[in-house]
Regions:
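Membrane-interface loop/short-helix elements at transmembrane-helix boundaries
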Residues: 210-248, 262-272, 276
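Actinobacteria-biased recognition of intrinsically disordered, low-complexity terminal regions
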Residues: 1-34, 135-139, 143, 181, ...
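Membrane-interface helix-loop-helix junctions at transmembrane boundaries of multi-pass membrane enzymes
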Residues: 24-31, 131-145, 182-188, 293-310
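A membrane-periplasm/extracellular boundary helix in multi-pass inner-membrane enzymes
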Residues: 178-220, 233-234
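Transmembrane alpha-helices of multi-pass inner-membrane enzymes
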Residues: 41-44, 311-349
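Membrane-interface micro-motifs in multi-pass membrane enzymes
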Residues: 108-124, 274-278, 324-335
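Hydrophobic transmembrane alpha-helices and their immediate junctions
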Residues: 11, 25-27, 73, 277-314
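Alpha-helical transmembrane segments of multi-pass inner-membrane proteins
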Residues: 33-41, 65-105, 109-178, 295, ...
Length: 349
């Protein structure tokens, strides 16, 4: 009989199929996700209305997440081991074989930006460890965990210390997940960790930390990045409802205009959404992350698989708090795939 270790919903029937209560709960969670994503897409159109603010970038990101999630649900149901293992291997191979690998130059594979590549590798670590927990034999589990560790080492080789630290965190959380009896506590911990990261960046941007600590963090994050964050906070305060409009941060930001070769974003998903779509957009971003955690809580997969995926997605959220890695549709699609894999209901043997 299949069981969902530490799950929040009812147990499966003896024939391996979901019971009526579990199907209803899963449908409600899916409906909630649809409502959040559709609401966010609608709000982006409202924020763009009446001004030269194309919402294409956000709509593409939402489409990538949705398509990735659907793909992950299907692949995870059919191939609970091969699908996440294939995802992890594909990311690692793409990072290794593309021209300019490990150089940190403009053509660094596969996205042309080392930190975005590192974000993909964090997801690869999570996918490999999810596959390891679903693998039937200890040797295969060892191989898959080695693949996950290799993805983390590759992030360090690309020059992303934050990506390496996130991958190590995913590995440690995955190894510890078997000792967690209730997944809800761990998922709440992931939410709190993300909230602390967001609060910390806001404190740096508004210079509300003690002077010594603020100067130290600003030095590590770089002064131009912190200046962009301050511009974004100012825009959100001046335009709290609709923001300045999607894709208009660079036009409105003195810091971004000064750095003509820099990124057209505040290098933070949180600050970008707040500046360009106001506080309603920021609330929808938080609701989307909360929905992902709720989906993992209700997932019929084992607790180690769920918490491993949750750790990887939390690592990605922390990277997105201090960099614009979610501006890449490939990253958002990969995040959707991993969430779908962890939420899938494997078909009965």
């Amino acid at each position: 009989m299949r069981t969902a270790t530490g799950g929040a919903s009812g147990a499966m029937r003896a024939d391996g199929r979901d019971g009526p209560e579990e199907r209803v709960q899963g449908s409600r969670t899916d409906a909630l996700g649809v409502a959040v994503l559709v609401g966010w897409a609608t709000w982006s159109l409202i924020a763009a209305a009446g001004r030269p603010a194309p919402p294409d970038g956000l709509l593409l990101a939402l489409l990538a997440v949705t398509a990735g999630y659907a793909t992950g649900r299907i692949a995870g149901a059919l191939l609970p081991v091969a699908a996440p293992a294939g995802m992890a291997l594909a990311i690692v191979v793409a990072t290794l074989v593309m021209p300019g690998r490990l150089s940190g130059a403009a053509d660094t594979p596969p996205l042309g930006y080392p930190n975005a590549d590192a974000a993909l590798l964090v997801l690869a670590t999570g996918a490999a460890c999810c596959a390891a927990w679903s693998a039937p034999s200890p040797p295969l589990r060892l191989v898959l965990r080695t693949l996950g560790a290799g993805a983390g080492a590759l992030a360090l080789a690309l020059g992303s210390t934050a990506g390496f630290a996130a991958s190590v965190g995913v590995l440690l959380c995955s190894l510890a997940a078997s000792h967690m009896r209730r997944r809800l506590l761990a998922l709440v911990g992931f939410a709190l960790a993300t909230a602390i990261a967001v609060g910390g960046t806001y404190a740096v941007a508004t210079d509300t930390l003690p002077s010594g600590l603020s100067a130290s963090l600003a030095g590590q994050l770089t002064a131009p990045r912190v200046e962009l964050w301050r511009d974004a906070v100012g825009m959100a305060e001046d335009h709290p409802v609709r923001g300045v409009g999607p894709d208009r941060f660079r036009v409105e930001s003195a810091g971004a205009l000064a750095a003509t070769e820099g990124p057209p974003t505040p290098q933070s998903a949180v600050f970008q959404v707040a500046a360009e779509q106001g506080f309603p957009g920021l609330a929808l971003l938080g609701a989307a992350f909360a929905w992902v955690l709720c989906t993992l809580w209700r997932s019929p997969r084992s607790t180690p698989v769920v918490l491993t995926a949750g750790a990887a997605l939390t690592g990605l959220s922390m990277l997105a708090t201090v960099d614009h890695v979610l501006s890449y549709a490939v990253v958002t699609a990969a995040a959707g795939i991993l969430a779908g894999l962890a939420a899938a209901r494997p078909l009965p043997d």
